[in-house]
UniProtKB/Swiss-Prot annotation:
This is Tryptophan synthase beta chain. SUPFAM superfamilies: Tryptophan synthase beta subunit-like PLP-dependent enzymes (SSF53686). GO terms for molecular function: tryptophan synthase activity. The lineage of its organism: Bacteria, Pseudomonadati, Pseudomonadota, Alphaproteobacteria, Hyphomicrobiales. Belongs to the TrpB family.
């Protein structure tokens, strides 16, 4: 484990859950006792060697960690420039990084005596991971999913139902991830006695952004060790896609105090930053949503704007509060990739490396296609391949068929 130093980028949040002006806990009065209970339970679990040992055992024997650090030789040759490595978190059980966080939260729920688990999901990967761990531990599971996402992510809906979860399509608002999170929060308020809300990203009220980051930091901790083994030194740059930003925070956090490591987060630019998109840093401003202050997409009246991305997992009008702080602190550079750029990267990676990525990390690959050729050959670049693309093949196939007909 890497440890934070004084004046560190890794020392947040403070005791009230703030990263600078971001974060906090803006919740209904009925939820505050739960939030405080959760914070205490997490602090106790974090300090308990038995909890950590049990989690590490499940990571090894159930999740399949550590995930490999893979040299993408053909992509490197194709692009010229930087030597590109993939952190292969799509090889985890359930097919994405989401299981890292869900394992920790479900273990915490059991420790707190909660038998009913609720979750929100966009692409369905967090929902699948939650349904999987609930099946493993014999817990009731309800997953809220925007009706639009239910349509475009049918394979994951079927997986969740197969695993015994109840999937609730959300018909309000734009019927995507924000609306699913709203419904999950409503459920939690009315079922506080027996229900644990398993949030899927580094958002929500404190302690969620910190807790999810800590559970996901296994990605960056492994990468440090693996890169030293492979190259004898740290990487020169890191690249990861960002919706709420948990896969990115998991990779970035252990490297924040290494000034030699450049860090790039990639938001979803959708149809373009002047049109419909989901790039909260590039096109948003600070506000409050889902229990925390962060950068959000808002209209001129301060109402939350609708986000758009080809990728259901990035289709969220906000970003984790720690990302907002890292942006303002200028430690991380935030870029954005359009739907079309992500589609091109999805196809390129499938054909060059025999790896079909999820549309979410395809956004990160799209920016690697721009960044890598500008770097010298000795530059070591690590990309978090945070999800596999099985869930997206029907959607991408349909888009490509339509385009072929039109051309």
């Amino acid at each position: 484990m890497t440890t934070a130093r004084p004046n560190s980028y890794r020392s947040g949040p403070d005791e009230r859950g703030h990263f600078g002006i971001f974060g906090g806990r803006f919740v209904a009065e009925t939820l505050m006792p739960l939030i405080l209970d959760l914070e205490k339970a997490y602090a106790d679990a974090k300090a308990d060697p038995a909890f950590q040992a049990e989690m590490n055992s499940y990571r090894t024997h159930y999740v399949g960690r550590p995930s490999p650090l893979y040299y993408a030789e053909r992509l490197t040759q194709h692009l010229g420039g930087a030597k590109i490595y993939f952190k292969r978190d799509e090889l985890n059980h359930t097919g994405s990084h989401k299981v890292n966080n869900v394992l920790g939260q479900i273990m915490l729920a059991r420790r707190m005596g909660k038998r009913r688990i609720i979750a929100e999901t966009g692409a369905g990967q967090h929902g699948v991971a939650t349904a999987t761990l609930c099946a493993r531990f014999g817990l009731d599971c309800v997953v809220y999913m925007g009706a639009v996402d239910v349509e475009r992510q049918q394979p994951n809906v079927l997986r969740m139902e197969m695993l015994g979860a109840k999937v609730v399509p959300v018909q309000s608002g734009a019927r995507t991830l924000k609306d699913a999170m709203n419904e999950a929060l409503r459920d939690w308020v009315t079922n506080v006695h027996d229900t644990f809300y398993c949030i899927g990203t580094v958002a929500g009220p404190h302690p969620y952004p910190m807790m999810v980051r800590d559970f996901q930091s296994v990605i960056g901790d492994e990468t440090r060790v693996q890169m030293q083994e492979a190259e004898g030194r740290l990487p020169d740059s890191l690249v990861a896609c960002i919706g709420g930003g948990s896969n990115a925070m998991g990779l970035f956090h252990p490297f924040l105090d290494d000034p030699s490591v450049e860090i790039f987060g990639v938001e979803a630019a959708g149809h373009g930053l002047t049109q419909l998109h989901a790039a909260s840093i590039a096109g948003g401003r600070p506000g409050v949503l889902h229990g925390n202050r962060t950068y959000l997409l808002m209209d001129e009246d301060g109402q939350i704007a609708e986000a758009h991305s080809i990728s259901a997992g990035l289709d969220y009008p906000g970003i984790g509060p720690e990302h907002s702080w890292l942006f303002e602190a200028k430690r991380v550079t935030y870029l954005s990739a359009t739907d079309d750029e992500a589609l091109a990267a999805f196809q390129l990676l499938s054909r060059l490396e025999g790896i079909i990525p999820a549309l979410e990390p395809a956004h990160a690959i799209a920016k690697v296609m721009e960044l890598a050729p500008k770097k010298p050959k000795e530059h070591l670049m690590v990309v978090n391949l945070c999800g596999r693309g099985d869930k997206d093949v029907p959607q991408v196939g349909e888009i490509l068929r339509k385009r072929a007909k039109e051309s």
